[in-house]
Amino acid sequence: MHRCFSKKAHSLFIKAEVDYRKALEINPKSTDAMFNLGNSLLMQQKAKEAMEQFESASKVEKDKDKLAQIYHNMGVILQSSKQYPQCIEAYKESLRNNPKDDETRYNLALAQKLLKDQQQNLS
């Protein structure tokens, strides 16, 4: 059952990717389409492409709540690739836009601990 769900979910993320790319062809400045395309790419383990979409959206988005979500997702990608200093900055930027986001605050604390552990293991 789980495997079947996984295949179904994956096909939905592929369809979403196609649809959001079409939306961006119609309106290349749509930060909602960039963000949602980034999310669909992320769910397909296409982190590099997802990051490109989030970076593009972060340059034009004005809404603080949406910016917080964008930077949060950038932090998640950077954390998963162990780029802790950049990850920490992304989470801090997310919190500047939405200081009440407990999930981002937790992720920031975790990333700071992981960076400290990484630095201790190198010395």
PLM features per residue range, with description:
Residues 1-22, 26:
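Alpha-helical segment of the N-proximal tetratricopeptide repeat
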Residues 7-11, 28-31, 47-48, 63-65:
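Short, mixed-charge, low-aromatic patches
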Residues 26-42:
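Membrane-anchoring signal-anchor transmembrane alpha-helices and their immediate flanking context
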